[in-house]
Amino acid sequence: MPQSLGNLFILAAPSGAGKSSLIKALLQNHDATEIHNNEMQVSVSHTTRAPRPGEIDGVHYHFVSRKVFQELITQDEFFEWAEVFGNYYGTSKVVIEQTLRKGIDVFLDIDWQGARQVKAQIPDTATIFVAPPSREELMRRLTERGQDTPEVIQDRMNKAVSEISHYHEFDYIVVNDDFTAALAELDAIVSSRRLRKEKQVMRHQSLFENLLASD
């Protein structure tokens, strides 16, 4: 993909690590709505699962049938796609590329498999792994929701351990023990990516041309 002003970020984490809360708080700190503003936004994925109460098509997800999803796969419309808990999820190529060209940072909320697929296609992607502070705390967070059976909780715990085993594949690691500290670390990562030479030259090209102009 051609160089773009916007930055692509991937956040991956086991269920219960607090990844979604961190993304939401980061965008709110930058005067965003829950999912987007003029400088950063969360990618809206396609999925075959049914909408949950309060979810809006095109805002939280693009809800499609399995048949439509399979057609999009055949047409090579996704950067990455995966089956999670019996449902398909995918990230649209066109939407991501158009958003980055506008200079808007994009956050992908995907697992390690998706991160690997996207990184292979866009090496400049910043991958961030959000980890819980301990195994005990992770189990507590999974249990306190009060929505799942012990079997479901154990299944999520097993999948969490599998996700954590790939932490070494990521560029950055944020341990979400103290939420405020974890949010500050995430914000620092975003700032550092924006301040890289390549991005600053694109952003301030006219400035440097003026500074270096002959009298």
UniProtKB/Swiss-Prot annotation:
Q: Which key words are in the record?
A: ATP-binding, Cytoplasm, Kinase, Nucleotide-binding, Transferase
* Main localization, broad class: cytoplasm
Pfam families per the UniProt record, alphabetical: Guanylate_kin
PROSITE patterns recorded for this chain? GUANYLATE_KINASE_1 (PS00856), GUANYLATE_KINASE_2 (PS50052)
CDD domains reported for this sequence: GMPK
* Gene3D superfamilies, per the entry: Guanylate Kinase phosphate binding domain, P-loop containing nucleotide triphosphate hydrolases
InterPro entries xrefs: GK/Ca_channel_bsu, Guanylate_kin-like_dom, Guanylate_kinase, Guanylate_kinase_CS, P-loop_NTPase
Indicate where this protein resides in the cell.
Answer: Cytoplasm
Catalytic activity line of the entry: GMP + ATP = GDP + ADP
Ranges for domain Guanylate kinase-like: 6-191
Q: Name one GO cellular component term.
A: cytosol
Top EC class of this enzyme: transferase
| Stored SMART domains | GuKc (SM00072)
Q: Which domain of life is it from?
A: Bacteria
* Residues noted as binding ATP in the record, renumbered to the chain: 13-20
Q: What's a Gene Ontology MF term here?
A: ATP binding
Family to which this protein belongs:
Belongs to the guanylate kinase family.
Q: What does this protein do?
A: Essential for recycling GMP and indirectly, cGMP.
Return the protein name.
Guanylate kinase
Q: Which gene encodes it?
A: gmk
